[in-house]
Amino acid sequence: MKDSFLFPIVFMLIMVLIFAGILSIAFRTSESKIEAHRQNTYQKRILSTLSAKIAETTGSKADKILAQYPESYEKYVYKINNKNLGRNAYRAVVADSTVAFCFEIGGKGLWGTMQALVSTSTDFRTILDFAIVEQQETPGLGARIEEEWFLAQFRNRLFVTEPDAPGDVTRKYEFIAETQEPENDGQLKRVTGAT
């Protein structure tokens, strides 16, 4: 039988079935852990975008609020159930008062879609923080959008200039090369390959 031309085919088929079965069992047994980890990571990102405002309001420190996850998430963060928004939205509540909002945003990158979280002040005029949830950019270049220097430049940025004015009231920013230094508050550094 070993000299038969069918032996390698049957052997490979049996090996494929065995290893596919092992892989399927491993996936099914770890699926709930993977989903729980994904959910925890997402909630921590939401909390991180809201933690500075929560800390400012409570007199605590943002690091302490983050360290107390999941209790701090359950205490301060509430999902906004509004189907008209068309996206996930959350609010930070301290002493029965909303102190900030967090919205999920998305768009196209060079290699795939991206998801991010942006937190705003309650009047929606200021971007408080920004965090990348998911991106599929090149690890050496485009994925640099997750680096602290890039994310930090969006913190506490004015988003709406004159809310009562007619027409477009959003603040315009100019994107400059990463190697340049911003000359004014209206310039943000960009990463080539991550738009």
PLM segments and residue spans:
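Flexible, solvent-exposed loop/hinge segments and secondary-structure transition points
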Residues: 1-195
